Each structure stands twice: as C-alpha cells, then as structure tokens.
C-alpha cells in the first residue's frame, strides 16, 4: 500500500513478486513512466534532467526501453491479487490517465480491481470527507482480503465525499 511513489512501489511489487502479496492499494501512483515523463508540468521543467537520470531519458531508444521495463503497466498481467486504485481527477503530477490505463489492463486480464476516483482532488486527498471515505474503502478492502475487521462508513459520511467507484 502506498501513495505516489509508494503507489508505484506497490504496483512494482505486485508485478514482479506477485506471490508475496495478498492484495494491494495504489493511491495516485504512476503506472507508466513514459507517460509520466511526457506529462511533466511546466513548473517541473527544472527537474526534468534529474527525472531522466533516475527513470531514463525517454527521448532515446535506450532510455525509453528502460522506462518501459520499469513501468508496472507493461507487466500488469503478472498481478494475481485484487487491487484498489484511488486517483484524484485533477492530479497535475500523476494524471488520471496513469490509473485509467492500469485499470484497463487489469480488467482486460481479468484481474479484480476497485477503482475510486475523486473528482475534486489532485495529488493526494485534501478534503477531510474524501480522506474519511478513502480510508474507509481501503480499510474494508484490506479486511476483505487479509481477513480482518473494518469499521463501516455511514451512508452520510460516504455521501459527504465525492468518491466515485468506477465499475467495468
């Protein structure tokens, strides 16, 4: 379970070592390093060189191959366990398309995925109502897949959030 890089790390773990996981939770984590780098906002331009050093220069064949090899999207069919993905629609850093393409790949492979969108959030959850709803959904998801318990969220609390569970 993780947010941003932690979400990416969760996806990497699930794709490279699926036997070690009972389930996973990815919150605003990138799934495709190529599209992540191609959508760098203008105010991040100053750190592009650092990102290319860490991920690979996608303007070169070798760098693009490296970025793709490190991208969970291209190994999504290796995932064997259920995944919950939460994404802010207005995320300027990890665009919704990162999660959309991962969800599509998982569903195409018959892998169970719960996809929760927050239309009024960005890179993380700021509104307390959304954080409460997301945490409750995660708690219920983990209880179901790990065999624990979860405190149910009330209908009023869920309705106060903007969480949208995206079905097939």
Each model region followed by its residue ranges:
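Active-site-proximal cap/loop segments of hydrolase catalytic domains
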Residues: 1-168
């Amino acid at each position: 379970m993780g947010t941003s890089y932690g979400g990416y790390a969760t996806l990497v773990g699930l794709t490279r070592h699926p036997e070690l996981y009972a389930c996973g939770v990815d919150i605003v984590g990138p799934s495709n390093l190529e599209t992540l780098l191609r959508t760098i906002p203008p105010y991040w331009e100053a750190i592009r060189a650092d990102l290319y050093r860490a991920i690979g220069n996608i303007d070169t064949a070798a760098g693009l191959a490296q970025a793709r090899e490190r991208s969970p999207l291209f190994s999504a069919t290796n995932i064997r366990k259920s995944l919950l993905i939460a994404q802010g629609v207005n995320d300027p850093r990890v665009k919704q398309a990162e999660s959309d393409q991962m969800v599509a790949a998982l569903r195409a492979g018959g892998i169970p995925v719960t996809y929760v969108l927050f239309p009024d959030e960005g890179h993380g959850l700021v509104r307390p109502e959304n954080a409460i709803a997301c945490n409750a959904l995660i708690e219920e998801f983990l209880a179901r897949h790990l065999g624990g318990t979860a405190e149910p969220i009330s209908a009023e609390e869920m309705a106060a959030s903007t969480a949208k569970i995206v079905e097939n």
